[in-house]
Curated annotation (Swiss-Prot):
Family statement drawn from the similarity comment of this UniProt entry: Belongs to the methyltransferase superfamily. PrmA family.
Classification lineage: Bacteria, Pseudomonadati, Pseudomonadota, Gammaproteobacteria, Enterobacterales
Binding site for S-adenosyl-L-methionine: 145, 166, 188, 230
Record-linked Pfam families: PrmA (PF06325)
A GO term, aspect molecular function: protein-lysine N-methyltransferase activity
Any one GO CC term of the record: cytosol
Protein name (record): Ribosomal protein L11 methyltransferase
Subcellular location: Cytoplasm
InterPro entries to which the protein is assigned, alphabetical: Ribosomal_L11_MeTrfase_PrmA (IPR050078), Ribosomal_PrmA_MeTrfase (IPR004498), SAM-dependent_MTases_sf (IPR029063)
Top-level EC class: transferase
Amino acid sequence: MPWIQLKLNTTGANAEDLSDALMEAGAVSITFQDTHDTPVFEPLPGETRLWGDTDVIGLFDAETDMNDVVAILENHPLLGAGFAHKIEQLEDKDWEREWMDNFHPMRFGERLWICPSWRDVPDENAVNVMLDPGLAFGTGTHPTTSLCLQWLDSLDLTGKTVIDFGCGSGILAIAALKLGAAKAIGIDIDPQAIQASRDNAERNGVSDRLELYLPKDQPEAMKADVVVANILAGPLRELAPLISVLPVSGGLLGLSGILASQAESVCEAYADSFALDPVVEKEEWCRITGRKN
């Protein structure tokens, strides 16, 4: 069915209030969109992370009288009479099909493919991870996830234990298992991430080799041959003493979620414990790898 879209521009601080106002005016759904295409990262549990300059978009039934909607919104203290907005008639589409059509199998390195479940696998002899895109966690489309997947693909993981620190969807741990690791351990602060990782591991037939923990539940003295952490530069610096002890002597470390401008400060936090490789950049992001002293 056709829809009518009303778009408002506001600050991140006011976005939730205007979302409520649009719903009260009859919107059937709300979308937050970055006005300037600035990166935004996965929020903490219970938090909605928004951009400084945010578009709030309300979707209305095609029969809605938008003059009435505008009149209601003009009474909102954040808007007022003559507030700036854009109303657009959307053509009738199969929105779910259009969304699905935007996602294709993606190759990382020489062997690894990440494939949506509704697509045919491009190479049945390759290492294929089946993972559907979702709202909350990584699927390989972000440069930092791509950098980590390419790195894992370049390693001989046969028989190795891998820790995915901040596992999100479990994509890195699952990829490691499919690439030959004997065991993977996923750690995340968000119970939803733990469940997402568990579901994705079952879909890929590796759940029997994946252990998942909240930080408070992880075993003491946990060690691995390979540790990968695709989180943010701030936590990587703050957690360096904890992350640095996870690899065995001679073990490998891979860090991402880091802007290229932040690489030097993250390297400094790990330089005493690791022989670091040259930083690898992709777009404005980078990956730091090294071997435990």
